[in-house]
Regions:
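Cofactor-binding active-site loop characterized by glycine-rich and histidine/acidic residues
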Residues: 33, 43-163
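Thiamine diphosphate
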Residues: 109, 113-116, 121-224
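Generic beta-sheet signal
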Residues: 64-66, 138-142, 169, 228-236
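Glycine/aspartate-rich loop-and-adjacent alpha/beta segment that forms the canonical ThDP
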Residues: 2-5, 212, 217-277
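N-terminal capping segment at the start of a domain
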Residues: 22-39, 174-176
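N-terminal hydrophobic or amphipathic helices/low-complexity stretches enriched
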Residues: 2-26
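Nucleotide/pyrophosphate-binding catalytic subdomain
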Residues: 8-9, 58-62, 273
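Glycine-rich beta-alpha junction loops
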Residues: 50, 72-73, 176-177, 211, ...
Length: 277
């Protein structure tokens, strides 16, 4: 296992037999990663697990790219890579580890992540434009959060990508209505999300972000949109898949007591066994 690989590196290899299985394992692994610290960005893995599983299911290893614009979502790609046997993520969140809780320019797995929210889409369209010049047909799967839509740079990038017809660009927009200051819709009105992206010239669809088959199907439809970029507005929850979370738990930054961690691991293990039965 390499600690520095990225999904677009030549020679990297993985396969996903069942993205539903992988989504559950992403959640399970994320709990294992957060448990030693007792807190962390577990909610971001819970809301994006199906999106990341679908991206790994359809992406071509060593060709396509993965960009993680909201750096605190990096836990989900890390968990997926670990479950696919690409990385050993022990030490996640510890001082000196490459597997930092908030992604940096040193982070493996993804081709780009950033500290300041709203910058990732600009980098992704740069990849798409450069790949066009190189004659590459690589797709760029780009994770974006709904809170990032409060940043003007996202909309500048959206305009640019549509103007240049960057059909290789596919945004997985995690619409979980959660950010550090509270529910997104109480801070800034960003709806109707899909209609706004469509008005900018994008192929835009609303998707149940926890239906991995629907996400995979939407990614397949996006592949046919080679003349314009695509965005999947994935409706999700930062609590999805963990019934044991207390009702007042802060989904943006979850406190995971030892008792809650054990309950979460037990619940997810049972769900995985039921899926495989």
């Amino acid at each position: 296992m390499s600690s520095t690989l990225h999904v677009s590196d030549p020679g990297v290899c993985w396969s996903v037999a069942d993205p539903r299985d992988l989504a559950l394992r992403i959640r399970l692994r994320a709990v294992q990663m957060v448990a030693p610290q007792g807190f962390g960005y577990l909610g971001q893995a819970l809301s994006s697990a199906e999106q990341v599983a679908a991206a790994f299911a359809v992406a071509r290893p060593g060709v396509d790219r993965l960009v993680c614009s909201p750096a605190h979502y990096i836990i989900a790609p890390f968990a997926a890579a670990a479950e696919l046997g690409l990385l050993d993520v022990s030490g996640y969140g510890q001082n000196g580890s490459l597997f930092e809780a908030i992604g940096t320019e040193r982070s493996p797995v993804v081709d780009y992540t950033c500290g300041s929210l709203g910058q990732g889409l600009s980098a992704a369209l740069g990849f798409a434009l450069a790949d066009r010049f190189r004659g590459s047909d690589a797709r760029i799967f780009t994770m974006v959060s709904d809170g990032e839509l409060e940043e003007g740079q996202v909309w500048e990038a959206a305009l640019f990508a549509a103007h240049h017809g960057l059909g290789a660009l596919v945004v997985l927009l995690d619409a979980n209505n959660s950010q550090v200051d509270g529910p997104v819709d109480t801070i800034t009105t960003i709806e109707p999300i899909a209609a706004k992206w469509s008005a900018f010239g994008w192929h835009a669809v609303d998707v149940d972000g926890h239906d991995v088959d629907a996400v995979c199907a939407a990614l397949g439809a996006a592949a046919a949109e080679r003349g314009r970029p695509s965005v999947l507005v994935c409706r999700t929850s930062t609590r999805h898949g963990l019934d044991c979370l207390p009702p007042d738990a802060d989904g943006h930054f979850i406190k995971l007591t030892p008792e809650l961690a054990r309950a979460a691991l037990s619940e997810l293990t049972a769900k995985l066994e039921a899926l495989r039965a």
